[in-house]
Design a protein with these regions (language model features):
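Membrane-interface helix-loop junction between the first two transmembrane segments
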Residues: 108-125
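N-terminal chloroplast transit peptides
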Residues: 1-30
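IMPase-like, lithium-sensitive Mg2+-dependent phosphomonoesterase catalytic core
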Residues: 40-113, 140-407
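N-terminal, Lys/Arg-enriched amphipathic/low-complexity engagement segments
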Residues: 120-133, 141-148
Length: 407
């Protein structure tokens, strides 16, 4: 248990190694077996110092506890920082490892053919091998990467994913349940629009241990958002950013590609009480209920409780729109019952509340809703506390009519 795990361990791989390329990129790999984990030694990085200086820190403050000049994700949540506990630390290590691999796949010019390299089950013959050679959608590949990483962690009993019809029972002894959307916004990849991974972590419910496997897997996955012990998202954009909360604030870490570390760049994020931005597809304005139309008309004329004209900013990528809202305030919303409570609404609402904001379905707090179905959908409004409260005061803001459009 005293052996340190180096984050720079690599293994041979068929991915991205083009013989004509003089400098093949070094890919990220999931560990292939359960690992005893302690935070790795700190590594020096120029970009780490640069990030600190851009945050307005002095040279002395940027030096931190060591000589490296930055705090990595694993340092920050380990025994010298938040001390989230050994089990959660190991789980987080495997989640961030998987997300680095997804980031590489999303950014790769070869991602349209990556499916044939992505089979993680070890099957080598017959129909299974034939299926493995067929390209898969990138969201399915991402789902397989995360499932493999969670299995290797040894810390997860159940994984429930937006990509699977039913939750997957992984390990009888795993202390955690993980719910996730492996690649939100995947339809945007061809246009290089930001995408993201969303995840939530619950404690396994030991009172269900004697139930049939399918039943206990489902019930463990249908916990209220109030029972989350951790949640986060990873934004794949011009930078790869992991934003997470462990019940003591919301913190964002940016991937330093020179070292492979997620570096703390936004500690203790606080969503402004009011913003000046709303994010919604307002081409659907005439499908909205009267209350939502009145709210949007009011704030963009500067006649709301915050006497400034609001601007519209809409990417049509939930993680990207929410990340901007976290930093600048305002509201990111989808007023129709489109987003999934378990995989998207609960984790993001948890992050919003930990940052001083709010998640709502237009009438009540998202985290107060008890899920009754695994793929349950609902409207979602995320953002500044006072903006959400003002929105709810308009009454009916949930879209009832879905005319059949996809986005």
């Amino acid at each position: 248990m005293q052996q340190l795990l180096s984050p720079t361990i690599s293994y041979p791989s068929p991915l991205f190694h083009l013989t004509s390329h003089p400098f093949p990129p070094k890919p990220h790999f999931c560990p292939t077996h359960r690992l005893s984990f302690y935070p790795p030694p700190k590594m020096a990085s120029f970009s780490g110092f640069l990030a600190k200086s851009q945050m307005g820190m002095t040279a002395a403050a940027a030096a931190g506890d060591g000589a490296n000049g930055f705090s990595s994700l694993m340092d920050y949540v380990g025994k010298g920082g938040l001390d989230v506990g050994d089990d959660l630390l190991v789980l987080l290590y495997h989640i961030q490892f998987a997300c680095k691999r997804i980031a590489a796949l999303v950014a790769s010019p070869f991602n349209s053919a990556l499916g044939k390299h992505s089979a993680l089950t070890g099957a080598t013959s017959g129909a299974a091998a034939s299926d493995r050679d067929k390209p898969k959608p990138l969201d399915i590949v991402a789902n397989e990467i995360i499932l493999s990483s969670l299995r290797n962690s040894g810390k997860v009993s159940v994984m429930a994913s937006e990509e699977d019809d039913a939750p997957i029972w992984i390990n009888d002894d795993g202390p955690f349940v993980v719910v996730l959307d492996p690649l939100d916004g995947s339809r945007n990849i061809d246009a290089s629009i930001p995408t993201g991974t969303i995840f939530g972590v619950y404690n396994r419910l030991p009172e269900l241990d004697n139930q049939p496997t399918e039943e206990k897997a489902l019930l463990n996955s249908l916990q209220s958002g109030r029972k989350l012990v951790a949640a986060g998202y990873v934004l794949y954009s011009s930078a790869t950013i992991l934003c997470a909360s462990f019940g003591s604030g919301t913190h964002a870490f940016t991937l330093d590609r020179s070292t492979g570390d997620f570096i703390l760049t936004h500690p203790s994020i606080r969503i402004p009480p009011q913003g000046q931005i709303y994010s919604v597809n307002d081409a659907r304005y005439f499908d909205w209920p009267e209350g939502l139309r009145q709210y949007i008309d009011t704030v963009r004329q500067g006649k709301g409780k915050f006497p400034k004209k609001y601007s519209a900013r809409y990417i049509c990528s939930l993680v990207a729109d929410f990340h901007r809202t976290m930093l600048y305030g305002g509201i990111a919303m989808n007023p129709r019952d489109h987003l999934r409570l378990v995989y998207e609404a609960n984790p993001l609402s948890y992050l919003a509340e930990q940052a001083g904001g709010k998640g709502s379905d237009g009438k009540r707090s998202i985290l107060s809703i008890q899920p009754v179905k695994l793929h349950q959908r609902l409207p979602l409004f995320l953002g500044s506390l006072e903006d959400i409260d003002e929105l709810e005061s308009y009454g009916d803001v949930q879209q009832k009519v879905n005319p059949g459009y996809e986005v």
